[in-house]
Amino acid sequence: TEAQATFCFNLGPDHSGRMLGTLLAASRKGASAPSRHGLATLLYGTLLPGPDIGRRCADILRGVRDAGFDTGVLGWDGVAWQRRVERAAPAWIERQMQRAVARYRDIFGEAPRAHAAAGWQTSAHALRLTQRLGFGFASDTRGTHPFVPVWNGEVTLCPQLPVTLPALDELLGQQGCDVDNLHERLLALTAQAPATGHVFSLQADLALALQ
């Protein structure tokens, strides 16, 4: 059986090396950081310049769409987003999101309909922009069911489809769960799905490293 998915892409510079501590901590739970990301990737943004993902991988990204999958944006610079968005000025947030939308248009020839926030980090202005920039839905949060965000009385008319299940690296951190049985743990969590279903977030690099 083929599983359908929405692929959300980082479309700007790859600065993975700036989160080296986080990557190494995650590697203790499963695949090692070098096998998951490659040694060069662990140096991007520090000792090596971060490659432009959208420009370098445009054909690959279009191939995902051509294979029948929905696509969306994960942002411009995912590392900077996770570190700054909570306290960033509205102008910085808007610039990050607009650059991602513009690059998506360049690659796919149309506006993105889906938005996912890197690391599930967001803010009032970021939520506001999901509506202003015309996204059909976003998955910027974690929760139990779909909802329309309301922040200090301000309604954002872009529905959120929150991630309801733990990520693979989180499952690997649970007692008794390892690479060989994590699929069983995930299936057990979805045995009785809520009326609105589940949303599972999977990082492609981790999935490949665990194969």
Describe the role of every protein-language-model region.
Residues 160-181:
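Positively charged, amphipathic and often flexible ligand-engagement surfaces
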Residues 164, 201-205:
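Short, loop-centered acidic/histidine patches that primarily coordinate divalent metals
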Residues 170-172, 207-210:
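A generic structural signal for short coil/turn motifs at secondary-structure boundaries
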Residues 1-114, 119-159, 182-200, 208-211:
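Catalytic alpha-helical scaffold of carbohydrate-active enzymes acting on polysaccharides/glycoconjugates
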